[in-house]
Amino acid sequence: QIVLSRRFSRSFRGDDFNVYRALRCVNPSPYLFYFDFGGFRIFGSSPETHLRVAKGKAYIDPIAGTFRRTGDDNRDRELAEKLLDDPKENAEHIMLVDLARTDLSRGAGNVKIEFLRQIQYYSHVIHMVSRVSASVSPQTDVLRLFADTFPAGTLSGAPKVRAMQLID
């Protein structure tokens, strides 16, 4: 599987920080960012982090499998069950979990799946999420671990190296 994307840029006249503040309101997410580099700014929001390292462990939380929320809690629970039963969504999700395991094993040990196919609700979507963890020693080069796991499988596809070659 290859994840294709396109570059998009647009000139904008106005207060981009107000656009960012509006984004925070319409798409509240655990990870929000705004970088002002003088000549250009980058901002966004995401429920996903690439790699987290804390207290001797490294974590990747693959997110694959997404359904739009309806605004009706009962209907959303039904959709969550459909998501868990969907063969295509599950196949993609398991592929990303396996990719996270492989990526973490390059620079860390004792790789394991902490939870698999957990449903998480966000303001506009329902996601299927897993957590893959690995042990890291104090001597682990965290930047090397980041490089070993970059880019996330949700951005590249799998098998990662071949997908990246085809994308390039």
Language-model features: locations:
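Extended alpha-helical targeting/anchoring segments
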Residues: 1-168
